[in-house]
Amino acid sequence: MVAIQSLSLTTLLVVALTLAGCSSTPVPEDSFYRMGNLPEPSLVFDSPPVDGRLMIEVPRAAGIRRQRGILYSEDEDHVEVRRYYYHFWEEPPPQLLQRRLIERLRLANAAVSITEGLSSDVNYRLRTRIREFDRVVDAGVASAVIDVDVILFTGFAEGEAVFRASYREQVQAESDLMVDTASAFSRALDEVIDRFLSELEGSL
């Protein structure tokens, strides 16, 4: 009886110490990131190149890029894509891109009016597709990579495609901190939009 009691006390002590060790390791907190402040417009049109009401569709993306978890790749060819468990965007990348497009295009006077909602009286529709929205780490150096397809259609229904382009930007983060990667994403996205606006000017 004494041996059994001693064994039970020893077991309880081991369990208690194990639990104490586990509880001493803090669980990482979730962190959320947004796009940075809008930059000063690099281009403002005297007259809108899109002569009418423009609707910005919700950007399309593969399933994994419609979620808020930040994606990353560390292999040399960037074939394998993973997701961070504790780092999230404030909104999914399609909504981040749509919001940034609306804000930047309005500041640039790119269209007579710009809307995100469905409306039968729009004259143009801007459709985008996110191909990459990833944090890429090469030799310990983190970069933000954004790859987007852009198509501008006439009419409310899918009419004629009057503009079509693809843009890819890679911006190195200032450090390996995730907050600096988020800032790099903001700069990369603004570079994509700047290129789109500069090409839009002479295409319509």
What do the predicted segments below correspond to?
Residues M1-T11:
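Bacterial N-terminal signal peptides that target proteins for export
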Residues T18-G21:
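C-terminal motif of bacterial Sec signal peptides marking the signal peptidase cleavage site
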Residues S23-P94, S203-L204:
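A structural "domain/chain start" motif
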Residues S24-L43, L107-E158, A173-S175:
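Surface-exposed short loop/turn segments
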Residues R53-P59, L71, R125-R129, V145-I151, ...:
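Soluble periplasmic/extracytoplasmic beta-strand elements of cell-envelope proteins
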Residues L71, D77-F88, F156-E191, R195:
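Short secondary-structure boundary motifs at beta->alpha junctions and helix caps
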Residues P94, Q98-I102, S186-L189, I193, ...:
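Extracytoplasmic/secreted envelope proteins and their assembly/folding machinery
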Residues I102, R106-A110, L197-L204:
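Sec-exported extracytoplasmic/periplasmic mature domains
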